[in-house]
Amino acid sequence: DKGGVVYRLDPVTLEVTQAIHNDLKPFGATIDNATQTLWFGNTVNSTVTAIDAKTSEVKGRLVLDDRKRSDTVKPLQPRQLVADDTTNTVYITGIGKESVIWVVDGATLKLKDTITNTGTFSTGLALDAKAKRLYTTNADGELVTIDTATNKILSRKKVQDDGKEHFYLNLSLDTAGQRAFVTDSKQPEVLVVNLKDGSVMQKIAAPASLAV
């Protein structure tokens, strides 16, 4: 397929029940359960695509960085996506040497805001919608906390200042326990981090980890 394909799987058997073809290659994905909208980041095109989960029809598309790639210009690329079902908002990491997070209105498919200064290759993204907190991780070894009410960075914490190389690629939240599970593609471990102060609560031995 010159573009890409999104597969719908049976949650019990994992059999493919549907194939949604798209002219652009999808990478990151999320779903807004309230609107039944699938959101896909088209990394190589710096674009996000919205698809109706019921009909599989494309609802719309938004170019997030329209700069033309050259030897000196490298458009930011969408990586991870999370949807806030309570506000119909989609957050998308735009990775590069100076990364951003795009804030997209799910109803209009328009860019509402751009959160800048999220670090080098800030790939990881997780949302605590109830607390209005968005978290991202980056290749600078940081955990960055953002207030979704204002789209402002509240804090940035260097998780481990141990002289080793760290690239915190992804994270997943335990909102009840106020913990983040953070993968490190440079070290053989997954970190359990306290979201209140950014301290490391535990290290779980694992091969150089990517997703969590």
Per-region residue spans from a language model:
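Predominantly soluble domains enriched in secretory-pathway, periplasmic, or organellar proteins
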Residues: 1-212
